[in-house]
Amino acid sequence: MESKLGLNFELVNRARASAAKIADDTQQFIDQHTTVTVERAVCRLLGIDGVNDMDVPLPNVVVDHLMANSLLPVGAAWAIGNAMVETGKDPQGVAEAVNSGELDLGKIPAHSDAEIRAAITPVVNATMERINKNVGKRNAYLKEWGDKEGPYLYIIVATGNIYEDITQAKAGAKQGADIIAVIRTTGQSLLDYVPYGATTEGFGGTYATQENFRLMRAALDEVGEEQHRYIRLCNYCSGLCMPEIAAMGALERLDVMLNDALYGILFRDINMQRTIVDQYFSRVINGYAGVIINTGEDNYLTTDDAITAAHTVLASQFINEAFAKTAGMREEQMGLGHAFEMDPAVEDTFLYELAQAQMAREIFPNAPLKYMPPTKFMTGNIFRGHIQDALFNMVTILTNQKLCLLGMMTEAIHTPFMSDRALSIENAQYIFRTMKDLGDELTYKEGGIIRTRANEVLTKATDLLSEIEKLGLFTTIEKGIFADVKRPKDGGKGLADVVIKDDKYFNPFIEVMKGKVGA
């Protein structure tokens, strides 16, 4: 791709090398540690499902039992496999026996690694076959109907009731949406368990549960088959259960997942050591399941200024790319995020927005970039808001962004009505249709505002990444360099649930998933 911005690709290469070094240094910590939610995700992938009489999910029952018996360092796969050899039960049977008190995993004699792996391998293979079938079904739909060229129209439903979400999602898909995201209920990020079953009472969103995933997936397939196009389903694996939600998404054929390496640390005060370990396994799973991940750089601009902090967004995109590569993901699955969030009262911000978006496209040419609409400077004036969204849509099509979250004219007033979404879809379709090839017709003036701005941001981001490489990621976060939010290394939620792995530890799913895509 020829650079319309005259970017210095020596700087790009330096920035990418710094980000890779940051990720590699952090990966040494990741490889030595596991967490309760990583092990609960292993339980889920081994087929452990359901809740006990107190509505506690059985994966939590098993992992809490491992924690209480100081067995978490050997990992759920080893402990469950050992119990399978001893008792002849399958993983679900082991979990139910632990729950009833019939089985104490701490009192079972240790069997050989070969016996444990022999017991667990058929279960692992069965799960992989299920995920492979999901990937195959998605690919078959895309082969039959084709995939959309240009930006995906991406909308959100957030009623709190999965059945009402389905009504709204189907309406949005019929109006032309390509991706439906189901917002999670307020605070689910901070639950250290995943709720169970279909839910009807969320606040500001709907609980992410495996049953809700299944119901929405079936509904979107129904619309897709009517319309002869594949409708993608998106949810959120951030918070204290990142890998568990990734596992549920892989089992129920979700297509897109919000999955940022730093978001939970900065915006939910989750301990950085916990989040960094959790994001790795979640990305290994998403990579194998063919899921596009969305990163959360757009959130930085809600707490920091989009004009002065633009370089931190680019630096974070480089870091998220490096972490995704470390987890074995392909560039085509990296929906690196940014947003149209500059103050419209400032002159020439449209040019700065265009520079930022074009820069991201040139630096990450294979990434399906996720572009977020204006929210911070939406006032409740719906007419101005619709124009702001139109300008956002113009930048989207001019710079070939891929996942375009449609702005709503009623932003800052209320959760969108179905009619609001219809108008947003119409707005985007009009601009994308009439400006389809305009981006190819445009060049940017050498020495002009757009080129100068992009190169300034790149230079600052490269310098920042060089500084982070020296400091290390954890110290950088402590200093508040991202999003103007400081977090202590030993603070936040979930630190007590991070443990150093034992020599016996193994995670069979990382072994078979990393660096591969199901088929």
Model-derived regions, located:
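Conserved, well-structured core segments that form the ligand-binding/active-site neighborhood
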Residues: G202-R330
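Long, compositionally biased, glycine/small-hydrophobic-enriched stretches that function as flexible linkers
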Residues: M1-Y163, A171-G176, R184-N212, G239-I245, ...
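Hydrophobic alpha-helical bundle architecture
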Residues: E353-D420, L438-G448
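Glycine-rich phosphate-binding active-site loops on the catalytic face of alpha/beta enzymes
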Residues: D178-S189, E252-D269, N320-E321, F392-T415
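Alpha-helix-loop-beta-strand connector modules within alpha/beta enzyme cores
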Residues: K143-E144, V194-R232, I276-I293, F350-A367, ...
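Catalytic cores of alpha/beta
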Residues: Y163-K170, L240-R253, T308-A309, F383-I397
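Short, glycine-rich nucleotide/cofactor-binding loops
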Residues: I156-I162, E347, G380-G385
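Hydrophobic faces of well-ordered beta-strands that scaffold small-molecule active sites
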Residues: P151-A158, I179-I183, R229-C237, V256-A261, ...
